[in-house]
């Protein structure tokens, strides 16, 4: 479980993810959003999963964090369609989860840095970029999308 904060803008962060993560992180993010929604009393989305994971706790911490994550999940779905010319089946669940969103993603709190200490800096975006370049570059491919500058 993780969210890769490769940019402060949830759309750009989705566009910067490699093919493997565009596919995988849609489901993981929907699971975190579903867990947060269920913790707030909503019976929607997937069953709760990893409720005590630092990133799931962050998503549930404020409506603004939830808003960032839901927009990011939607943008990952858009990225999936751009790269593979298909619609990810989780997109419907993400739309349902969006219905309870009442936050402003610009007011989100700093997310946890779920990565080895060697990649961490004071800036969470730089930390996630360090982690991505240092640990994910070996398998990173970008179908129908240019490689982000920090990965070159």
Please describe what each predicted stretch is:
Residues 1-52, 56-152:
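Sequence termini and other peripheral, non-core segments
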């Amino acid at each position: 479980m993780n969210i890769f904060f490769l940019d402060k803008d949830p759309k750009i962060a989705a566009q910067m993810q490699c093919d493997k993560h565009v596919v995988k992180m849609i489901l993981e993010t929907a699971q975190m959003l579903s867990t947060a929604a269920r913790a707030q009393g909503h019976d929607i989305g997937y069953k709760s999963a990893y409720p005590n994971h630092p990133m799931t706790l962050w998503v549930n911490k404020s409506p603004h964090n939830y808003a960032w994550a839901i927009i990011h999940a939607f943008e990952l779905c858009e990225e999936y369609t751009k790269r593979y010319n298909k619609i990810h089946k989780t997109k419907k669940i993400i739309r349902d989860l969006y219905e309870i969103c009442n936050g402003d993603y610009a007011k989100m709190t700093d997310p946890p840095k779920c990565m080895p200490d060697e990649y961490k800096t004071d800036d969470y975006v730089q930390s996630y970029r360090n982690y991505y370049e240092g640990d994910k570059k070996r398998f990173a491919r970008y179908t129908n999308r240019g490689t982000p500058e920090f990965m070159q």
